[in-house]
Amino acid sequence: MARLTGLSAAALATDREGIALRYAKAWNAVVVLKGARTVVASPDGRVCVNPTGNPGLARGGSGDVLAGMLAALLACGLPAYQAAACAVYLHGAAADRAAAKRGEYGMLPHDILPELGALFAENQR
C-alpha cells in the first residue's frame, strides 16, 4: 500500500481505516489494507476491521493464499466488498486454527488450506 499511495508505512499506520476508505473512494475500488487487523473499505463508505488472524500471516505466501480465496469468492458471484470481507475473515480464522496447532511462527501458508476446509465443513451444517 505504501508503494501504491506514496505514503510511508508509519503514515499508513496512523489511520488505517481512514486511509483505506480514502483510497477506496479515490480509486473506486474495494481496498484491502493487510496488517494486524486487516481493513476492508469500499467506495460507498463501508469499512470493516477483521478480528481474525495472527502474526504468522506476515510470512511470505500468505497473501497469495488470501488472493486465491478472494478470487474464488468473486468467481462464485459475491460482490467485491462481501468477497473481500469474507476472504479476509476466513483467511484469518483458518490461520488462527493453524497457529493453535503449529504456533504462530511455526505455521506456513500451506497450513492455512486444510484449516479452511475444516471451517467450511463445520459451518455447512
Model-identified regions with their sequence ranges:
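Active-site proximal loops enriched in glycine and acidic residues that flank catalytic Cys/His/Asp
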Residues: 33-35, 42, 51-52, 61-63, ...
